[in-house]
């Protein structure tokens, strides 16, 4: 219960906090080889666990790290570990004047869960800035990197959400390890697409405004 946004539910048979990528790989492999049910958390938002708990292994990913390559023509290519808190990352992009996800402020959870659900708000969604996603393929035990196109994003859906394991467990075939984003440079937001947000900001739909104002709205 302490590890979900709803703060309800029973205990797991085994609960592990993975602070490094190596720990994530080891724990996922251990559970899969043992044939145990596996639940991977990278934030625990919008997750309901019954009072009976979870009869398997829960791996909570809390990996940290942000690496950026910035150029005047290519913008900012930013690779983020799956366990980084999402809203703190959004705040950091605004501070760095990287434009693209300012409208997704206030969404709970961690970076690794955002491409799975293709999270969105106010007419924006994360697929608009995802450059690539690096994962562990549980079926093959190998790393697999997806381009934005290969992620098969649609409304609140992706290949990561739709690709299941044969046992049909709660965690899918691909465990997200890191997400790379591409941002434009500057202190102005992307064009405001959502009418209500535009009204609050005092601009027309399609106009830009300071990213910090979008976050505060």
Give short role names for the model-derived ranges.
Residues 2-139:
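Anion-binding (especially nucleotide phosphate/pyrophosphate-binding) glycine-rich loop
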Residues 2-8, 143-217:
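Phosphate/pyrophosphate- and phosphate-bearing ligand-binding catalytic cores of soluble enzymes
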